[in-house]
């Protein structure tokens, strides 16, 4: 699959444009964004909606308390049910095959990511990046981090990963350096 990152602050119009323009077939979103996601599905090619929640990654008893905090913080709580095109990430992971998928990619030609521009000159444009593009960009960052010891660093991610700079300089570099985040 090809990743299309999106800004969680996008309006319905911006999200709908990006999903339709990219031809996305699956959207993975946090539960608090579910109401917005459901409003943009028409006029897109989205076939599956996968929803995850912060509470899914909290230890007991915080996972039970969090929905109350969420309701207080956002003014609503979201109850998402596994039905139709909507799937819960935790359920997918529970029933997923544990055997690795064997697939072949051409790192120079196959797209890994469609990164949308900021849209400063009109509608945002999808920039097509191959696997090799991402490796090259991350390798350039790696040169700047020459003092990092592979496998021993802890990287604090303060940049948004949906932005290409945060994805490259934090997320992908952390993987390349075998670091913790």
Task: Please describe what each predicted stretch is.
Residues 79-116, 123, 148-154:
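Conserved pre-ATP/AMP-binding loop-to-beta segment of ANL
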Residues 115-118, 159:
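Active-site beta-alpha turn of Rossmann-fold NAD(P)-dependent dehydrogenases/reductases
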Residues 13, 25, 109, 131-132, ...:
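Structural detector for helix-capping/boundary residues
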Residues 135-154, 162-181:
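Conserved AMP-binding/adenylation subdomain of ANL enzymes
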Residues 92-99, 127-148:
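Conserved structural elements of the adenylate-forming
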Residues 2-91:
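Structural core segment of the AMP-binding/adenylate-forming
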Residues 7, 158-163:
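Conserved AMP-binding
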Residues 119-120, 178:
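Conserved G/P- and acidic residue-centered "switch" motifs that form tight phosphate/ATP-binding loops
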């Amino acid at each position: 699959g090809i990743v299309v990152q999106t800004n969680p602050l996008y309006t319905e119009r911006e999200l709908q444009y990006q999903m339709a323009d990219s031809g996305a077939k699956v959207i993975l979103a946090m539960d608090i964004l579910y109401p917005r996601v459901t409003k943009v599905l028409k006029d897109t090619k989205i076939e599956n909606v996968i929803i995850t929640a912060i509470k899914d990654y909290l230890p007991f008893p915080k996972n039970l308390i969090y929905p109350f905090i969420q309701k207080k913080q956002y003014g609503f709580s979201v109850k998402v049910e596994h039905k139709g095109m909507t799937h819960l990430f935790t359920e997918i992971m529970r029933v997923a095959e544990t055997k690795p998928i064997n697939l072949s990619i051409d790192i120079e030609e196959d797209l890994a990511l469609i990164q949308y521009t900021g849209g400063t000159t009109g509608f945002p444009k999808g920039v097509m990046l191959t696997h090799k593009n991402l490796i090259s960009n991350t390798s350039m960052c790696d040169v700047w981090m020459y003092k990092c010891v592979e496998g021993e660093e802890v990287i604090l991610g303060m940049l948004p990963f949906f932005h290409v700079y945060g994805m490259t300089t934090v997320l992908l570099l952390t993987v390349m350096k075998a670091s913790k985040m």
